[in-house]
Amino acid sequence: MDQSTKQTRQQSLPRHVTKTHFVFGPNIRPAMSASRSETIRLDTQDCYQGLITEDPATHLQIQEAKQIPVTGPVYVEGADIGDVLCVHIQNINLSTTGVFAIRPQTGIIGQDIRDQVVKVLPIKSNGLMLNKSISVPLQPVVGVIGVAPKHGEIET
């Protein structure tokens, strides 16, 4: 592949952001600037901030996070305070594993849970694999998305 083809291909790939933080606020330095029509990629983290690995014992070492990590911020060129922004989610690429964690007194059935259970399960094209023959279809969600307030900070 010649140099001009490489440059064209690199220019056509969306720029991406990996920086995370835990508040929306006007004083957080943007991770990137983007035009209104530009396609960008955001590499996000789960609510455990990517700290739970294939070893379920790692969950026992993690204190429940008070905040959810958000990726960015992205400064949208030409956007003014008070503008409504429309974001199109083109695709959600999933990790190769998902975490299933329950513990006593947490969640809707927490009062019925006696022991903490953590499972790190594989994600395949047909869903979350509970075992070799049973998979649960997935419905990916975006999570937290928002804009900075004019004054103050909002925790995630």
Where are these predicted regions, by residue range?
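A generic structural signal for residues embedded in beta-strands
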Residues: 42, 84-87
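Generic recognition of long tandem-repeat/solenoid scaffolds
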Residues: 15-17, 23-25, 75, 119-121, ...
